[in-house]
């Protein structure tokens, strides 16, 4: 149920809400020309200096790719094997944490493209964005709640190493559930951090990313347009969230309601 165009049309219907709650949905985002009943655009190009061929000012495929990289980390964290001398589980998790999938080598793991009940059209992370990773956007500041003066990046890598050597990712002796720990911490240190401490913080000031200039040289969207869109992408909600009931949103998050998820009926 994902299609690729400007960045990607169908993507993470996973819903990231705040630092503690995250329900992942597979929904369309407003990036493309489509029969989306007015939800998906195209949204006009308002950046006056742009002379290219783009017709839709919305673009946040990188954020959606990161949502799916987060999902993959959570899934892989349950595959730890203390008897693997090659550290393969850790290495695979690190690939989803570090790699920008320009060469399209990272498969989408959750939701599964091969699912018969809740399929998605894209197969690879790189189908959504070839320039996105998690490690580059994780909080670089010292995490005072952790020993050793670790940054947010260090903490996630530390937990990945532990998960890779823990059977099933759950250390019952020490009370550590690494799929949950890695997921929740990544949501806070990457997704929430970027949305609330970057795009909706510094980039909302008058002197940063002004609305009468391109976000960056050659961009087809203004500074404030793109800052809002990037924050929305990190939140991760479906473009048509406001047309869903609470029950539908919940069922989509549980991958139960494909009809509600596929708002523009393109399969």
Name every feature range the model reports, one short phrase each.
Residues 17-27:
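Bacterial N-terminal signal peptides
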Residues 8, 27-28:
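Short linear Ser/Thr-Pro motifs
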Residues 34-267:
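Mature extracytoplasmic or organellar-lumen-exposed domains after removal of signal/transit peptides
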Residues 12-14, 22, 41:
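Short non-domain terminal segments
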Residues 5-18:
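Bacterial N-terminal signal peptides that target proteins for export
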């Amino acid at each position: 149920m994902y299609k690729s165009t400007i960045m990607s049309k169908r993507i993470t219907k996973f819903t990231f809400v705040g630092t503690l709650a995250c329900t992942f949905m597979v929904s369309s985002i407003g990036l493309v020309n489509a029969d989306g009943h007015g939800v998906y655009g195209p949204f006009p190009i308002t950046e006056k200096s742009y002379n290219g061929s783009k017709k839709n000012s919305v673009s946040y495929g990188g954020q959606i790719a990161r949502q799916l990289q987060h999902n993959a980390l959570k899934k892989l964290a349950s595959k730890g094997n203390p008897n693997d001398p090659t550290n393969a589980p850790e290495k695979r998790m690190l690939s989803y944490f570090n790699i920008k999938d320009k060469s399209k080598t990272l498969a989408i793991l959750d939701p599964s493209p091969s699912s018969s009940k809740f399929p998605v059209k894209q197969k690879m992370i790189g189908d959504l964005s070839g320039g996105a990773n998690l490690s580059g956007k994780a909080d670089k500041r010292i995490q005072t709640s952790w020993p050793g003066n670790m940054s947010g990046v260090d903490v996630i890598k530390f937990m990945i190493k532990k998960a890779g050597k823990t059977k099933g990712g759950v250390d019952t002796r020490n009370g550590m559930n690494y799929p949950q720990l890695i997921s929740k911490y990544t949501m806070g240190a990457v997704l929430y951090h970027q949305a609330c401490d970057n795009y909706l913080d510094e980039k909302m000031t008058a002197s940063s990313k002004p609305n009468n200039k391109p976000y960056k040289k050659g961009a087809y969207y203004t500074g404030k347009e793109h800052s809002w869109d990037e924050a929305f992408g990190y939140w991760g909600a479906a473009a048509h969230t406001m047309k869903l009931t609470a029950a539908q949103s919940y069922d989509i998050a549980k991958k139960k309601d494909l009809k509600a998820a596929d708002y523009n009926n393109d399969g």
